[in-house]
Structure formats: structure tokens, C-alpha cells
Amino acid sequence: MTLLLVWLIFTGVAGEIRLEAEDGELLGVAVDSTLTGYSGRGYVTGFDAPEDSVRFSFEAPRGVYRVVFGVSFSSRFASYALRVDDWHQTGSLIKRGGGFFEASIGEIWLDEGAHTMAFQLMNGALDYVRLEPVSYGPPARPPAQLSDSQATASAQALFAFLLSEYGRHILAGQQQNPYRRDFDAINYVRNVTGKEPALVSFDLIDYSPTREAHGVVHYQTPEDWIAWAGRDGIVSLMWHWNAPTDLIEDPSQDCYWWYGFYTRCTTFDVAAALADTSSERYRLLLRDIDVIAAQLQKFQQADIPVLWRPLHEAAGGWFWWGAKGPEPFKQLWRLLYERLVHHHGLHNLIWVYTHEPGAAEWYPGDAYVDIVGRDVYADDPDALMRSDWNELQTLFGGRKLVALTETGTLPDVEVITDYGIWWSWFSIWTDPFLRDVDPDRLTRVYHSERVLTRDELPDWRSYVLHATTVQPAGDLALAVYPNPGAGRLHVEVGLPVAAPVVVEVFNLLGQRVFQYQAGMQPAGLWRRAFELALAPGVYLVQVRAGNLVARRRWVSVR
């Protein structure tokens, strides 16, 4: 057996790491030079058995790396297996060309220090491995403007502070259980980490009239939450709104009055109620909103701005306010906004909308939303939540702050921020989710230089919101070819920073005839090819990358 360990040592700024296959540890494979077009002294082949592999040892600076293989194989597909330290991935590579070519299997995150890699390519040849550093920039900041033009000075200051920290720090947040007389979640975090969350989310659930009608006990009150906030703590409020009427009381369906916010435990029809403003059920909607307004008024009187997150997770359909589809939901959201802001004069609210995947049509509109959140309950405690972040950046990047408004796990902040994932804040759901988080992970995150805890908050009330209009920072370097083209369109764009990329094609009437959302892409050259079944004519190709945009004319021929 050939045995050769290679250690690559890098210092300073992360550079490309190149591992020549023939310099690795060869297990059941051999160096060959029969084929042409390889680099170095040869390539490695003979991956015939499952245990055959080439292994490397190397050192790397901390960061995100794109993994690229120089390979060759004769079949259309070749199966591979890659292990880097404890991380493992399998898949198939698609043949391109007749000799050696480069194939990428995506990105990995490496901590600073020593690493090991093992690679298998069944019935193929490995020339080299490249680890190409990828740098992600911060998210684009939205305009410094709240939806409520009469927002209180403290609400404006809090929003200005959140804007200033977006892409620099993530605020540590925690959901508090409303059924404990003590602040058990906050106390647990303090006991484990020695710190308190900068932001705590409380629930107005038991102030719903159909819960109070059953004599519900208020274990915590807005006065308690105001006392916790003091002058510097940040308050978020949600509302599990028990349906205004028509609750199902049926133990055989596991339905009781206290489950009245679930679609399955009420027959209340929000669409019908909204359609008839003279109906009793519409009046009950207003009654409930007015009751909650009285509780929110306490925060305004105490000069406590509120990150107000009502009607959450509507597109999931499991709550009655989302049971009838997007249009009644948006109508209810706007009614709630108008009633609280303009009827009750509540100007201390920063409105937080909770987005669900693939539910863009549920968005109430920029005029009614200040921040967009996402509630994520991942099975994997190490989940990066990249797809959630990328979707939100594609839809709202440069328009709205984005927050992880609920999470059942706690992502490793050092890792996700290297991927350019900078939530405005995270909020861990209460037990059992909070106690399921590894205490070491909780402590590391709370002590991270990329996270702000309560003791690290500045005097955010001194921040000033300067309304601005975000303008494109410049043109993108965009190329489209062949031009003219017969159905196949190639797009190449140089991305100065990581950004969500959207490709659109418009006809001369201004109608969009094609759209492709690529999600968040790293800085550098980005290219795609598209098969377009378009009539002959002149089209406009537009590429948006965050708040950058470029357009080119393209001619389609047969």
C-alpha cells in the first residue's frame, strides 16, 4: 500500500487549498498517468471496492469553502462519497466532456486547524481536490422607514438600532412560557450562560376574550413584562388568538376551549366574518382586537416599543386566521393594523410578519409590515436554515429586516454568519425546545462576539431613524449569449458580494415571460444556461442581485 500524508499549512487570509490525488494516502487505489490532461505527477484510479479511497490531511483557516474535484470517468454518471472530519456526503457526478473536468458538490464550513478528507469515486479517476474559499457579505439593509409614519420616538430608535446591527450582530432572544409565574426560560438561560437574552417574546394568548370567559388565570401580565424590559430590554409580543366564537368542545377530537386558536378546534369562518361588516362575527373580531389594544396601550404608556408579531404562521393553515387562504388573511392583517394604529392610536408597534416557505402570496404588503420573520423547527440541531434565509432574502432582501422569530434549535452562529446568514434576532421556543439545546452550544452562542445579549446592549433609545431611499449601488457586469440565440440563453454575471440572484425575461409589452430564483449566491462569477421556448423577437433580460440590477437586450430566433 502506498502511504503518503500531506499537510498543507495556511496562515492569514484564507486562500485556495489544492490537494493532488497522487500525494494523498492511497487505500486500494493507485497512481496512473495513462490518460492525458491531468495535473501534477498523475491521477488516482482503481476505485473498485467500497473501501477504496484516497485520503488527505490538511490545515485550513476557518471559513466556507466550495469543494471542487478534478475527475474523469467513462460512464454518464459516477457515484462518489466524501468525508471531511465527521461530515459525510454521497451523490452522483455527471460527465462533462471527454477527459478530466471539474465538478463541484457544493460548500462546506471548516473550523480553523487540522482536517482530514476521504474521497471515493466508483469506476473513475481523481486528479485533484480544490477547496475554494467563499466569502459572503452582509445582507442588504432595508430603508430606514417604519410603516407607521407616526411611530413613537422609542419605536423609531429601536428600529434604527436593529438596522444598525443588521449584518453585524444577531440579537439573542427567548420565548417565555406564559404559564409560569417566574420567568423560567430567562432564568434557565442566565443559569447556563451567565447572561440574559437581549430580547424576550411574550404571548398575549390568555387575553383573548373566549379564554377569559372561561376564567383563565394570568400567570404573567403585561405589567410583569414591562418591569422586565425596564429601559433597555427589548420586548416582542405575539398573540395566539382564540377564535372569537364557535369553539369546538369535543374531547374525542382533543378539542377544548384552550385550543381555540387551532383550525381543527373552531368552526369560525374568518372569510365570512370579514365579508359582512354588519355581522355579529365581524363585531366579535373588533371586540377581540379592542381587548388586545388595551393591553398594548400599557406598553405605549410606559414608552416600551413592541416588536408586534400577530397572526403568525398563517400559511400553514393550522391556525384559524389562515384557514381560508391568503386573501382573507391579508384582509384580517390590514384590519388589525388599521384598528390598532389608526383607531386606537398605537404607534409603538413595529409590525413583524411571519413568512412560510413558498407562500409569497400571503404577504400583506410593505405598507403594513416592518420586519419579516421565519419560524423554523428543524430536526437537525446543526441545521443552517440556509434555504429559509435564502428564500427570505430573495423575496425581501433590501426591503425588510429578516429575523428568526421562532426556532426549535439553536444554529451555531459562528458557522451561519460565515455563510452570510445574519438574522436580526433569534428566539428559541420555550421548553422542551430550550432545554434540548446543548448547554455548551447555548453558552458559546451567548458569548459569541457576533451575538448581542442584554448586558451588551447600547443605549438604543439614543438612536435616530433617518429615512432614506435605497438606491442601486451600481451596475452588475452582465453578459447574455448567444445573441441572437435559438432557445438556449446563457447568463453570466459578476457578483461583487454575496446576494440573492433573480433572472427575469420580459417581452416588449413589459410582460414577464420567464423567472428563475437562484437564492443566495456567493461573490464571484455566476453563470446559468436556460432553455426558453419563446417566440422569435426582442426581449429584455434582467438580473437582480440584492439591490443591484442589470439589463441586456436579447434576440430570440428559431
From Swiss-Prot:
EC code:
3.2.1.78
Q: In its UniProt record, which GO terms are filed under biological process?
A: substituted mannan metabolic process
Q: How does activity depend on temperature?
A: Optimum temperature is 85 degrees Celsius.
Give yes or no: UniProt keyword Hydrolase: yes
InterPro entries named in the record: CBM6 (IPR005084), Galactose-bd-like_sf (IPR008979), GH26_dom (IPR022790), Glyco_hydro_26 (IPR000805), Glycoside_hydrolase_SF (IPR017853), Secre_tail (IPR026444)
Asked whether the UniProt record includes Hydrolase among its keywords, one would answer: yes
Name the residues annotated as catalytic in the UniProt entry. Answer: 313 (proton donor), 406 (nucleophile)
The record's Gene3D superfamilies line, in alphabetical order, gives: Galactose-binding domain-like (2.60.120.260), Glycosidases (3.20.20.80)
Residues in domain GH26? 153-455
Query: What are the protein's GO molecular function terms?
Result: carbohydrate binding; mannan endo-1,4-beta-mannosidase activity
| Reactions performed catalytically | Random hydrolysis of (1->4)-beta-D-mannosidic linkages in mannans, galactomannans and glucomannans
The UniProt function text for this chain reads: Acts as an endo-acting enzyme with a requirement for at least five sugar moieties for effective catalytic activity. Hydrolyzes carob-galactomannan (locust bean gum) effectively and to a smaller extent guar gum, but not yeast mannan.
The family annotation for this protein states: Belongs to the glycosyl hydrolase 26 family.
Protein name from the UniProt record: Mannan endo-1,4-beta-mannosidase
